[in-house]
A protein has these predicted regions:
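Alpha-helical transmembrane segments and their immediate juxtamembrane cytosolic regions
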Residues: 1-236
Length: 236
């Protein structure tokens, strides 16, 4: 059975991501973009978790998600290749490594698709985590404590692989995150697992527009006052 509020949430996720990556619609320094940056990617991973089914065989899940998530990223990278290599003088080695890394930080012209390969990694990790928790009989409280520890680990690791110079092949390379954006996996996996854990509650939830409007006003007010800087892609 289709649930209207879940379809709305999925649509809003896509809209928020598009708005956040289009400077013509949302200025990077605007209040609206600051508000979107706080929750658009966490919401995306949370919603993805509500649709995750751990009873699917691991190989089937990985194959299906590769078709849905990895393939679009690779297709866009390949389509850009002739233009970037011939007319924009992009370095072939850097382009190849950037494509294989599955991370938009190494391919700035397709950076808006960075979350696709990462989401594939999140589904794989979420399957393994859920199987492990179920096998060892973790209860709700224990799961929540473990997920909170995972979130704290992710925050602690956040600057560890970002803009770090390393020497490789007689050259200095600037590390801009791990392949598949694996350095932010603990954070995204936290939201994904929370969505999976609370999926039944989320599906049964009843929403009141008055409460939603009031919450939105309070949220925007807090962002306007405190001006937090946050974003998984930029590791802040």
């Amino acid at each position: 059975m289709r649930l209207a509020h879940i379809d709305v949430a999925r649509g809003l996720c896509i809209l928020f991501v598009v708005l956040g990556h289009n400077p013509a619609l949302t200025h990077p320094d605007s209040l609206s973009n600051a508000c979107l940056a706080v929750f658009r990617m966490p919401l995306l991973f949370f919603i993805a978790g509500t649709f995750f089914r751990a009873n699917i065989p691991f190989g089937t899940l990985m194959r299906d998600k590769a078709h849905a998530l990895i393939k679009p990223f690779l297709v866009m990278a390949v389509l850009h290749a002739p233009f970037r290599l011939l007319w924009w003088d992009a370095d072939p080695t850097e382009y190849l490594l950037g494509t294989l890394s599955g991370s938009g930080t190494y391919l700035p012209w397709v950076y808006t698709l960075w979350f696709l390969p990462h989401l594939w990694l999140v589904f794989a990790s979420g399957w393994l985590l859920e199987r492990g928790l179920t096998k060892h009989g973790f209860h709700s409280v224990e799961r929540m404590l473990l997920l909170l520890m995972l979130l704290m680990l992710g925050v602690w690791l956040l600057p560890g692989f970002w803009m770090r110079p390393i020497q490789m092949l007689d050259s200095i390379w600037l590390v801009k995150g791990l392949p598949l954006s694996a350095d932010i996996l603990p954070i995204s996996l936290f939201y994904f697992s929370m969505g999976h854990h609370f999926r039944a509650l989320f599906q049964r939830a009843q929403y009141r527009w008055q409460a939603a409007a009031l919450s939105l006003m309070v949220f925007v007010g807090l962002i306007a006052v405190y001006s937090p800087r946050t974003g998984l892609f930029s590791r802040v």
